[in-house]
Design a protein with these regions (language model features):
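Beta1/beta-strand and adjacent pyrophosphate-binding region of the FAD-binding site
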Residues: 1-12
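Glycine-rich FAD pyrophosphate-binding loop
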Residues: 5, 21-45
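Short hydrophobic core segments
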Residues: 5-7, 30, 132, 145, ...
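An anion/pyrophosphate-binding glycine-rich loop and adjacent beta-alpha core
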Residues: 34-36, 41-42, 50, 56-57, ...
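Glycine-rich active-site loop/strand segments that organize a redox cofactor
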Residues: 47-95
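Feature captures the FAD/FMN-dependent oxidoreductase FAD-binding
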Residues: 75-156
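A glycine-rich dinucleotide-binding beta-alpha-beta segment and adjacent secondary-structure elements
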Residues: 127-130, 134, 307-387
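Glycine-rich loop(s) and the adjacent beta-strand/alpha-helix scaffold that form part
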Residues: 156-202
Length: 415
C-alpha cells in the first residue's frame, strides 16, 4: 500500500487526500492551522462558491493566469464530475447568477464538514497544527516529509499549501519555500483579485458607495486593455467589487511594465448611447428647469455621487438648470460615461483573494501534476502559477488539480 502525504488542507488538499484514500493509499494530511478548509470557508462571502456551470472553454477564458495548463486536469475532472461527486456525498447545490454554484444551504461549513466525513470514511489521518518544514529527496525522488513534530516516510507528496493571500487562513507562501528548497523555480508572486488604489482623493467622499450595472475599463497607452460589466464599490483608497477584482489581473500585468500609465474608466450608463443619454439629461433638465444643477440629477444618479460628477465636469452645482448651456450638458454626459481615475497601485497580496505567480508550471506535467524534476512530488491548487477570476473558477482549478495529482500519485501511469 502506497503512503501519500498531502501538505495543506485547503480545497486542493482536501480533494487530493480524499481521492488518494478512496483509491487505496494510506494518506496523511498535514495542516499547519487548527482546522482544514479555512480559506474555502470565506469564498463567496462565507457561502462557498464551489464551481461554475460554464463549459470548460469558458473556464480557460476565465483563468488569465496560465489557464491553458488546466486543459488536461479539466478533461480528467470537470465541474460536472465535481458536482456528481459532491452530490454522491450528500451535498445539495444550486446555480445562481453568472453560473456560480453554491451549496443549497449557503454554508461553507457544510462543504467542509462533508469533506471531513469522507476523509474519515477513507481513513485519512488528519494532523492539525503541524507545519511541514522540508521535503526529503533521494536520487531525484521524494522519500519523506519533515514537520516540526515528526519525520514521515512516503512514496509521494502533494503540495497543496495555497498562495500568499489571506495569511490568517494559513496561506503564507510556505509551499513556495518547500518547492524552492528541492530545486523548483518560483515565479514572481503578486496579488490577483485585489482592490485597486487610485491617485484621486475624492473617492473618500463616497467610500462605501456601490454601483451596479456599470462598465469598467482599464486603459493604457490610449487603448482599452480589459473591460468588465457589473458591480463595483468606492473605498477610502480607491476601488473594489467584482468588476475591479477581475480587472486587477490586467492592472497588475501593466504595472510591471516600464513607466505604466493606467487609468480606470467607469461608464455609469453603459446601456445608453451618448445621444440617448443627452436626451435623457435634457428631459430631466426640462422637468427641474428652475432648480439648481445638483437637484436636477437626482433621478439619474445616487445622491452622493452627484457632486463628484458635477465637479469632474467642472461645473457649479448651484447653477440654475435653465442656465446650463448645451456644451456644459455634453460635458456632464461625457463624465457620466467616462468617469476616469488614475491607478496608483494594487493593494498588498495579503488582501488579495488569490495569488498570481507560484511554482513554475514549466516544471510540472499538466496531465499528472507531477514534478518533472522530482519523482513522486506533485503540486495542486493555488501554490502553482495559476489564477482565475471570481465565480468559482479558482476552487474548480484547486479541486481538479488535486484530483489529478492524487490519481497519479496512487496509480502512476497505469491509471
Amino acid at each position: 500500500m502506497k503512503q501519500i502525504i498531502v501538505i495543506g488542507g485547503g480545497a486542493a488538499g482536501l480533494m487530493a487526500a480524499v481521492i488518494a484514500g478512496r483509491e487505496g493509499a494510506r494518506v496523511i494530511l498535514l495542516e499547519k492551522m487548527n482546522m482544514v478548509g479555512k480559506k474555502m470557508g470565506i469564498t463567496g462571502k462565507g457561502r462557498c462558491n464551489i464551481t461554475n456551470s460554464a463549459d470548460m472553454a469558458e473556464f480557460i477564458k476565465n483563468t488569465p493566469g496560465n489557464g491553458k495548463f488546466l486543459y488536461g486536469a479539466y478533461e480528467r475532472f470537470s465541474n460536472e464530475d465535481l458536482l456528481d461527486l459532491l452530490h454522491s456525498w450528500g451535498l445539495k447545490t444550486k446555480v445562481e447568477r453568472g453560473g456560480r454554484v453554491f451549496p443549497e444551504s449557503d454554508s461553507a461549513l457544510e462543504v467542509r464538514n462533508i469533506f471531513m466525513k469522507i476523509l474519515k470514511k477513507y481513513n485519512v489521518q488528519v494532523h492539525l497544527n503541524e507545519p511541514v518544514t522540508s521535503i526529503t529527496v533521494q536520487e531525484n525522488r521524494v522519500v519523506g516529509v519533515t514537520t516540526d513534530k515528526e519525520q514521515y516516510a512516503c512514496d509521494a507528496a502533494i503540495i497543496c499549501t495555497g498562495g500568499a493571500s489571506y495569511p490568517l487562513t494559513g496561506s503564507t507562501g510556505d509551499g513556495y519555500v518547500l518547492a524552492e528548497k528541492v530545486g523548483h523555480t518560483i515565479t514572481d508572486i503578486r496579488p490577483s483579485l485585489v482592490p485597486i488604489v487610485t491617485n484621486e482623493t475624492w473617492v473618500k467622499e463616497i467610500m462605501g458607495l456601490s454601483l451596479r450595472n456599470v462598465e469598467v475599463s482599464v486603459i493604457s497607452k490610449s487603448k482599452v486593455q480589459a473591460k468588465q460589466f457589473g458591480e463595483m464599490m468606492f473605498t477610502h483608497f480607491g476601488l473594489t467589487g467584482p468588476t475591479i477584482l477581475s480587472l486587477s489581473h490586467t492592472v497588475g500585468k501593466l504595472l510591471r511594465k516600464k513607466n505604466p500609465q493606467i487609468t480606470i474608466e467607469i461608464n455609469l450608463k453603459p446601456a445608453l448611447t451618448a445621444e440617448v443619454l443627452d436626451k435623457r439629461l435634457q428631459k430631466d433638465f426640462d422637468l427641474y428647469s428652475k432648480k439648481q444643477l445638483a437637484n436636477g440629477m437626482k433621478d439619474l444618479l445616487p445622491v452622493n455621487l452627484i457632486p463628484i460628477v458635477i465637479k469632474l465636469a467642472e461645473l457649479d452645482s448651484t447653477k440654475p438648470i435653465n442656465q446650463i448651456t448645451k456644451e456644459e450638458r455634453l460635458r456632464l454626459c461625457h463624465v457620466l460615461q467616462h468617469m476616469t481615475l488614475t491607478v496608483k497601485e494594487l493593494r498588498p497580496v495579503a488582501e488579495a483573494i488569490v495569488t498570481a505567480g507560484g511554482i513554475s508550471l514549466k516544471e510540472f506535467n499538466p496531465k499528472t501534476m507531477e514534478s518533472k524534476l522530482i519523482g513522486g512530488l506533485y503540486g495542486a491548487g493555488e501554490v502553482l502559477d495559476i489564477d482565475a477570476f471570481t465565480g468559482g473558477y479558482n476552487l474548480q482549478a484547486a479541486f481538479s488539480t488535486g484530483y489529478v495529482a492524487a490519481m497519479h500519485a496512487v496509480h502512476g501511469d497505469e491509471e
